Amino acid sequence: MTFRLRAAQIADLEQLYEMAKLTGGGFTNLPADRTALTRKLERAEEAFARTYDDLGDDQFTLVLENTETGQVRGTCQMFSQVGQQWPFYSYRMTTLTQHSQELDRTVRAELLSLVTDLEGCSEVGGLFLHPAERAGGFGLLLARSRYLFIAMHR
């Protein structure tokens, strides 16, 4: 069997939709919703077709294709800049330390703070590999392909 990674296309919609149904829901990078998937594929095609180098709000989607059967067996995504169309929320973990001299006691508490510090940063999106292909090292290939893509387009 031979596989290749390539840019996702609108023609991949049905195969990606069938794979999305295998996620069990809640996987935002691969929703089991044809309309949402269509928009993601349109954004990916627009991103790959772009000829200028300015950073935009691009979403790049790659698919893992079995070249013998033409079947899409996995997918992964990258986002050039997050927080451009709507806020990108993340959490910052901090430690709050308080001391009481009267009680001679120090108390530390870990806090999560909602922040938007990562706006404008690139994001490595999720990946999904068809369950039948999970033992062949293809997950590692998909995972690393995102970083290779970013390195090629710095």
Where in this protein do the model-derived segments appear?
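Conserved N-terminal entry element of GNAT/NAT acetyltransferase domains
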Residues: 1-29
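Sequence-level motif detector for i,i+2 pairs with an aromatic at +2
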Residues: 3, 59, 70-73, 119, ...
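Residue-level detector of conserved, well-ordered beta-strand and adjacent loop positions
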Residues: 6-9, 65, 79, 125
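Alpha-helical elements of Rossmann-like donor-binding domains used by nucleotide-donor carbohydrate transfer enzymes
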Residues: 15-18, 43, 145
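Active-site rim helix/loop that mediates acceptor-substrate recognition in acyltransferases
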Residues: 29-72, 77-88
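Conserved acyl-donor/pantetheine-binding loop and adjacent beta-alpha core of acyl/acetyltransferases
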Residues: 80-126
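Conserved acetyl-CoA-binding loop-helix of GNAT-fold acetyltransferases
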Residues: 107-111, 126-129, 134-150
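Short, intrinsically disordered, charge-balanced linker/junction segments flanking boundaries
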Residues: 153-154
